[in-house]
Each structure stands twice: as C-alpha cells, then as structure tokens.
Amino acid sequence: MKSFVKPERDSLLRTVRIVFTDPDATDDSSSSSDEWLPKPRKVKRFVHEITFLPQVSESSQDRSNAVKTPRRKSTRQFKYPVGVRPRPSGKFAAEILNPFTKTKKWLGTYETPAEAEKAYVDKKVEYDALASSGSAVSSSVVTVTSQCLRSPTSASVSCVSADDLSKEKTSLNKDVAASGDSTTKEVFTTFDFSDVKIPDLRFLAAEEDSMVSNANGAELDFDCFLTDSNILLDDYSLLENDINFSRFENSLPSELPDCDFTEMEFQLDDFKFAYTDHLTTPPLGLV
C-alpha cells in the first residue's frame, strides 16, 4: 500500500467550506404516481470551498533583525580623588587623616576637585616628612645610647650628642602636636583671660594668723590629773583590796591529789588514745 504524501504546498493550504440552503428550490425527480404520498419539502443545499495560503509567521531571524529598543545605560557615580568629597553647595571639600592624632583634619572648601586634591597632596607630603624625620631621630637616639653603653671612655661625648638628639626629638614632637591641634591652639590664643574674675582668698590668711597667735598664747595645764597630795591614783591597790585570790593564803601552795593517768583513755569517735603505750615511766606524785 502506497502512502500518499501531499506536496509541501498542499500542506500549507487552508480550506474554508461555506454551506448554505435555498428554500425556494424547485427541482423534483418524482413521478405523478407518487403524488398521493406525503413528501418532505425539498431544500437545495450549496457548498462553496475557498482555499488560501496561511499568513507567514515571523522567523527567529526576522525577530533578531528587528529594531531593538536601546537599553538605558546605568549611570556610574563619579569617583572623586582621595580626601575630596562634593558639598551640597556645588563646591568640593578636602580633608586628611592626621597620622599622629588619628583624627581627620579639615583642609578647606575649593571650587574644583583639582584644587581640593592639590591641598590634600601638599598636606600629605608634610605629614610624611614629619613622620620620616621623627623615625630618623628615634633610630639615631637608640644607636648613640648603645654606643654610650659600650664605650665608657667616650661616654661624655656620646651622652651629650644623645641629649641633643632627644631635645631635637622633643621639639619635633611639639611641632607635630602643634600642627595636629592648631584649632585648639587658636581657641586658647584668642581667649581673653583678663575678663576672668579671680576670687579673693585673703580671709584664709587672716584666719591662719589668728590660729597661730592663739596657739602661741595657750598654756597646757597637767595639774588636773594629780590629786591634792601630787600622787596619781594613790588610793587604788590591786592586790590588797579589790581582787581576792583564794587558796593562796600566807603565800603557801595547796596540796594536790595524786593522779594516775596510765589507765585513762580518750575516745574520739572511732579512735581511742591510750596513754599506757606512750608512758614508759610511772607517774610521779605531785606535791
């Protein structure tokens, strides 16, 4: 059995059938003898076919070649130089981190980013120079001190040079602190101390003088501790009147009974302690 394969064109064709009826049709093939039988009303039916090609769909290539709407490019934020940031007024501020005080130092506001960057670079060079000179002074002080310890003959010369270097380092540290705290220095220099009211403390000196004069004129009286006969606590006798010690009449000791501790045992919980195992000599009678 052969399989019928439709051509490619026929497979692409679309057919539309239009069917309708004509109620006024008059065609009749019956004879006159059949007139006595009831017959249904004949209706003429019409069928029309319309064939057409389907609409060609867009291919993927056509879609790729179509005009694409341009995508909106993301606007990247402009990167300003280090130490420069924009101000709401449209100008640019410059600031730098002080390596000695670990705080930010304000350098000012400028019209362009280039001016602000230049101020930052100049201040950074200044800080780098101060840091390098400070490290050089520290290393030289360490070497001079070690040489001073090793060679005692040249101790005076080395120590003098070490003192000079330490003074130089102290002055350098003062300069660094002054440069780092310029704002604080300006506040103290502009402050007027003449308006400060100093309290009058002269009344303290007057009270101190009066206390000293009273102490010099006072005399200590120790007579109140003595009786009329100038004997302190003459009427008090500890042994004769107040305390009575029994069994010591006529300053003689009393007789004590003889005690034998060899048969005595001390019992503490589950342990017994007998003195018979430890005493090798018989006890002596106590007189």
Curated annotation (Swiss-Prot):
GO terms for cellular component: nucleus. Transmembrane segments: none annotated. GO terms for biological process: ethylene-activated signaling pathway; pollen development. SMART domains: AP2. It is found in: Nucleus. Its main location: nucleus. Belongs to the AP2/ERF transcription factor family. ERF subfamily. This is Ethylene-responsive transcription factor ERF116. It comes from Arabidopsis thaliana (Mouse-ear cress). The gene is ERF116.
